[in-house]
Amino acid sequence: MSKILVVDDSYAELQVIEGVLKGANHTVVSFPNTEKLEDKVIGEKPDLIVLDVVMPGRNGFQACRDLKNDDRTKNIPIILCTSKGNESDKFWGQQQGANAHVVKPFKGEELLAAVKRVLG
């Protein structure tokens, strides 16, 4: 299956997302923040990034934009995973280059459906 990098500052959320993705036979690499995220992405070469929006320091919207503006990482699809579920946040995520948006709390099937849509 695919290698997926999950970025979330909440250890509990990382565990939930990892469990869902590993249960679907994906390889999962976790990262707790957006500091040095580009280096992590370049080193890991994931097929997909699941990125939380609400994080200290650089938020997920900013990190998404930075990854999509970097020639080394711009082609890696990103799913924003956040508690912000209103339409303006979804629109803003798309403007930053996100390929999909999953709202917390979510069911495992919702995340896996987004992964399948994005990866094909």
Identify the function of each model-found stretch.
Residues 15-23:
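Charged docking surfaces used in two-component/phosphorelay signaling
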Residues 25-32, 40:
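Short hydrophobic/Thr-rich beta-strand motif most characteristic of the beta2 strand and flanking loop
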Residues 44-50:
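Active-site beta3 strand of CheY-like receiver
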Residues 56-57, 74, 86, 105:
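The feature encodes the CheY-like receiver
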Residues 106-115:
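C-terminal output helix
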